[in-house]
């Protein structure tokens, strides 16, 4: 072996060792821990908020549930103090949420997911069946309402990267039940990191949540706000707008409500969740 080879071998060994250690560190990295707010006692309702929101958005509805339930409000990754998984995927978000679900009693737990919080819930329950007895989904998109070529998706996402403020305003400035509330929502939404928004939107464009939804063996209660469910639309048309393959499923309409449905209609929404929970827990005891 030449002198040059003797120098090269230790260098290669060190490089290989460093690479192996890097991979090992990634494999054994600490899981993402999501921040939660836990209130009350009794059977558990786990609630995951929407993109651009906070877990405290759900306090008005949570308070209506506290007489009979323990409520766990979960922070969506990339919001507040809960980090965004790297690399990002709904599967990774679901794994982070499962860290919360795994601590609950599966025989007395219902999960509520709002918008992309619903995609997180679907991913978690698809990967870990048996964590809950039922799922309530509020305005949850499973895919795009129409077929779009990957090239067009990429063009839109590139435009979002280059003109984030314009795209964010186009997508998220009309989510309220009226123009005044829409402006308030968008002001709050702008506090969310653009990296978080881009990650969720990109994943929403390129993944299909129907597979997760179809894999679940537990009942799903679908709920739509009146912002989405206009009077002239059928429930099937609403589900199609949200990208659902199954447009025959039952949907409950929440009147006079937008993205802040949990604030707009806390009594009605709590009643829907509570009635669903009662039915599911009763069925589980049979």
Question: Where would I find each of the regions flagged by the language model?
Answer:
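Catalytic active-site module of serine/aspartate enzymes centered on a nucleophile-bearing elbow/loop
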Residues: 247-286
């Amino acid at each position: 072996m030449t002198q040059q080879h003797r120098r090269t071998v230790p260098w290669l060994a060190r490089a290989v060792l460093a690479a192996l250690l890097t991979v090992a560190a990634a494999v054994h990295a600490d899981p993402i821990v999501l921040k939660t707010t836990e209130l009350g006692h009794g059977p558990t309702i786990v609630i995951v908020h929407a993109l651009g929101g906070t877990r405290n958005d759900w306090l008005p509805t949570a308070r209506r549930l506290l007489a009979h339930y323990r409520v766990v409000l979960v922070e969506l990754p990339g919001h507040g103090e809960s980090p965004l998984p790297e690399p990002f995927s709904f599967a990774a978000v679901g794994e982070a949420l499962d860290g919360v679900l795994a601590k609950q009693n599966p025989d007395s737990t219902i999960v509520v997911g709002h918008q992309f919080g619903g995609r997180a819930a679907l991913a978690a329950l698809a990967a870990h069946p048996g964590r809950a007895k039922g799922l309530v989904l509020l305005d949850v998109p499973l895919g795009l309402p129409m077929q779009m070529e990957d090239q067009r998706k990429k063009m839109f996402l590139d435009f979002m990267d280059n003109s984030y403020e314009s795209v964010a305003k186009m997508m998220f400035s009309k989510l309220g039940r009226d123009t005044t509330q829409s402006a308030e929502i968008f002001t709050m939404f702008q506090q969310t990191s653009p990296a978080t928004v881009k990650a969720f939107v990109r994943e929403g464009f390129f993944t299909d949540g129907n597979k997760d939804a179809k894999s679940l063996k537990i009942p799903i209660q679908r709920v739509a706000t009146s912002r989405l469910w206009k009077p002239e639309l059928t429930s099937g048309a609403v589900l199609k707008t949200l990208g659902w393959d199954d447009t025959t499923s039952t949907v409950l309409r929440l009147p006079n409500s937008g993205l802040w449905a949990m604030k707009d209609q806390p009594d009605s929404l709590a009643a829907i969740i509570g009635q669903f929970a009662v039915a599911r827990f009763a069925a589980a005891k049979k």
